[in-house]
Swiss-Prot record:
Its EC number is 2.7.2.11. CDD domains: AAK_G5K_ProB (cd04242), PUA_G5K (cd21157). Substrate binds at S54, D141, N153. It is found in: Cytoplasm. Catalyzes the transfer of a phosphate group to glutamate to form L-glutamate 5-phosphate. Residues 280-358 form the PUA domain. This is Glutamate 5-kinase. The lineage of its organism: Bacteria, Pseudomonadati, Thermodesulfobacteriota, Desulfuromonadia, Desulfuromonadales. It catalyses: L-glutamate + ATP = L-glutamyl 5-phosphate + ADP. Pathway: Amino-acid biosynthesis; L-proline biosynthesis; L-glutamate 5-semialdehyde from L-glutamate: step 1/2. Keywords: Amino-acid biosynthesis, ATP-binding, Cytoplasm, Kinase, Nucleotide-binding, Proline biosynthesis, Transferase. The gene is proB. ATP binds at K15, S173, D174, T215, G216, G217, M218, A219, T220, K221.
Length: 373
């Protein structure tokens, strides 16, 4: 099964964690060199590769005398400002022997939440790939604030699969996949070779927190796999410090854990709405509206809304909740909060009478709406 699925892959997003390329003495140039040679081998076989590389903060924090994780965002930003150039230099030097050039792309969540900037970033990415350049993506930690953080590069790598229109996500970790218990403390822990569907039990099994040098534990990796597989992209979590790990994976060796893509996956736009675009508000709806949206695939009309929370404009994402406040959908609002306060509970035929204009009958059109599974 794995070999058959991998035979259809053309474009790969490879996420490299801090725990893989960072050792006791700083950046592990031997590992970076080994991974670069692996990627060059894939490129020579006709694959396209997008690299998501952590390590900027871990590389730069030593210059500031920081032990462990930087405790504040300003310290993290300062460490990233020092470390990002060194990280890129390491990748540049590692790819040079095989005649490959690298290009840096730094992103914040806002870059992907804004559809125009998302498409601009995609155009840049596609141009780099067209010219045989290896894009190296990282979060723009020097300018990011809490509200627009990706949180970790596992999450960023999952969103990059949509940005890059990739066929496969490989997350290189310091653990060789998902186990039924922590393999670092339980030698008898059993590894899962294939996960067909990421259930709540699987998510709970991942558990755990990040390491001293990184922010992403197994829980964030499984969450990233869930986001990628919902877009139809298979995901492999594997030990990135194994020699020749990438060519071995693409040859079909049963390394790590393979999370299978969801057969009925989201469109690119709905994946963007669901995961890239941050919610600015909340709409509480009655049971009739909930059934229409969640069970019948209808648009959300103003008549079913009875309460509004948050501050949002037309075009912002909002969460849609039932009467008890449980989120069951997310979508893009066709009207601002101020406008909705005037038309909620009314029939669509009254919108133009109340506002003096009308963008449409729907508060959230079904084409701009994602129901939570």
């Amino acid at each position: 099964m794995r070999k058959d699925l991998l035979s259809q892959v053309k474009r790969i997003v490879i996420k490299v964690g801090s725990g893989v390329i960072f050792g006791q003495d700083g950046l592990d140039l031997d590992v970076i060199g080994s991974l670069s040679r692996d990627i060059c081998a894939l490129l020579s076989q006709g694959y396209e590769v997008v690299l998501v590389s952590s390590g900027a903060v871990a590389t730069g924090k030593g210059e500031l005398g920081i032990v462990g994780r930087p405790p504040t965002i300003p310290l993290k930003q300062a460490a990233a400002a020092i470390g990002q150039s060194r990280l890129m230099r390491a990748w540049k030097d590692a790819f040079r022997p095989c005649g490959r050039c690298v290009g840096q792309i730094l992103l914040t969540r806002d870059d992907l939440a804004n559809r125009r900037r998302f498409l601009n970033a995609r155009n840049t990415l596609m141009t780099l790939l067209e010219y045989g350049v290896v894009p190296v993506i990282n979060e723009n930690d020097t300018v990011v604030v809490e509200e627009i953080r990706f949180g970790d590069n596992d999450n960023l790598s999952a969103l990059t699969t949509s940005l890059a229109e990739a066929d496969l996500l490989i997350i290189l970790s310091d653990v060789n996949g998902l186990y039924d218990s922590n393999p670092k403390t339980n030698p008898a822990a059993r590894k899962f070779s294939v996960i067909e569907r990421i259930t709540e039990d699987i998510e709970q099994m991942a558990g755990g927190a990040g390491s001293v040098v990184g922010t992403g534990g197994m829980a964030t990796k499984v969450e990233a796999a869930k986001r990628a597989t919902l877009y139809g992209v298979g995901t492999i979590i594997v030990d990135g410090r194994q020699a020749g790990v990438l060519p071995k994976l693409m040859a079909g060796e049963e390394l790590g854990t393979f999370f299978l893509p969801v057969p009925q996956h989201m469109t690119a736009r709905k994946h963007w709405i669901s995961f890239s675009k941050a919610s600015r508000g909340k709409l509480l709806v009655d049971e009739g509206a909930r059934r229409a949206v969640a069970e019948k695939g209808k648009s959300l009309l103003p008549s079913g809304i009875f309460s509004i929370e948050g501050k949002f404009d037309r075009g912002d994402a909002v969460r849609i909740c039932d009467a008890e406040g449980r989120v069951f959908a997310k979508g893009i609002a066709s009207y601002s909060r101020q406008e909705l306060e005037r038309i909620m509970g009314r029939n669509s035929s009254e919108i133009e009478v109340v506002l003096g204009y009308k963008y449409g009958d729907e508060v959230v059109h079904r084409d701009n709406l994602v129901v939570k599974k």
